[in-house]
């Protein structure tokens, strides 16, 4: 059964500044690269996946810097403290709204598919009528009436609506897990 999740979905990106000399993801080899946090999907896992898909080993072929947050990663890249780095779409939108970014400030070398956010899940053994009603309520929730703290709990302040999500939406995550050789048993 499809359950609501946040929309729009963020995009992970590998980025650099225009005069870095780096024109492709493969050219990031032996350069510094800012990730936000090792536990971040858009700020670490998806950019590492993009590097791996380009033939780079994110553990050996780059000089990884963990900035600590998406904002810190953006600032390290923007201020040329690193040669390249992750810049997710939500951070880019936030920086644009604050006047800290304009088109042309960065070069985007790779972009992920939209990253599924955490879904609202419903126990499978609940009555179908209840599940359908809950999904309907969530899909028609007027997010503009929620304060920023409530929106953050729901996955971020940039969401505009809750939309149906299917299991197929997580195939990119499954491919990422396989490509990066992540042992899910060790994470539980």
Give a label for each model feature.
Residues 27-29:
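Well-ordered alpha/beta subsegment
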Residues 122, 126-188:
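An extracytoplasmic/periplasmic, membrane-proximal ligand-sensing/linker region
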Residues 23-24, 133:
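Short, charged, surface-exposed loops that flank catalytic or proteolytic processing sites
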Residues 8-10, 44, 61-67, 92, ...:
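Broad hydrophobic/π-residue packing in well-ordered secondary structure
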Residues 20, 31-129, 136:
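Pocket-lining segment of extracytoplasmic ligand-binding domains
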Residues 1, 104-107, 146:
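N-proximal short alpha-helices
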Residues 1-21:
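Short, glycine-/small- and polar/acidic-enriched structural segments
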